[in-house]
């Protein structure tokens, strides 16, 4: 059966290509008034070939020709590009509600509990409630100040490491990265974790999120992603990350009866879920999604200005 399916797909590909070419040469008679300027596109891939070698440079170059607002096609997906501060302000501030939604991407959905977090969730009641929880309970000024001791403790440990090195060569960027990761880990998860415990999972997730998914741009060719093994790899990583996050949650649930003066992010989320204090049912998968997005910040490189200023001091 699988053989017959593959034979059908590959044998029908030339016909599909011919149909696409005909469509490009004989466009629809529908009106396309008020569309921004657009560079010529190729059948099937649209303007994707013009994104090399770097999208930011390519977009800057095309903006000089087609203006600050232009229409591109990434595969079959139309994309409007704004290249000015004024345009960005219109989108991000003036008309933010209109542009606030996010497309659902298959690989992202597999890795984030169907976009159950704040970063990748579509605009809607769930996203608004989770944003409210984050602003009022996780990122409030009082909450951030309560973790000052954590930041001071980890900074002292880093300084001691530098002092103990004497005149030996040290990798300052690596030390800053460790400091950042430890602070985030203690604030979010309650304790530090060895990088090896989560590094393979996080590296795999970052790699998949950055990979080119054909289905994102040409939905009817999404089966190519399955043939490439992207779906299988995403499902494997999703299971590994769920095992890790479930372990974190169970560890916190065991200690919930003990008095904890300084609650971490997981403690707060579990408390909100248990007490239903916000009037919004915070599901377990939502908590897991928030934790994983937080863990992904472990992989973010530290700002280069920090080691530079430290070295000068």
Which role fits each region the language model picked out?
Residues 31-48, 57-150, 171, 176-185, ...:
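Cytochrome P450 substrate-recognition site 1
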Residues 103-111, 145-305:
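Cytochrome P450 heme-thiolate monooxygenase catalytic core
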Residues 17-33, 191, 275-279, 301-313:
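Cytochrome P450
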Residues 84, 140, 297-298, 306-310:
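Short loop-to-helix capping motifs
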Residues 1-30, 182-183, 296-297:
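Terminal signal-anchor or tail-anchor transmembrane helices
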Residues 51, 123-126, 261, 283:
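Residue-level signature of the cytosolic catalytic core of signaling kinases
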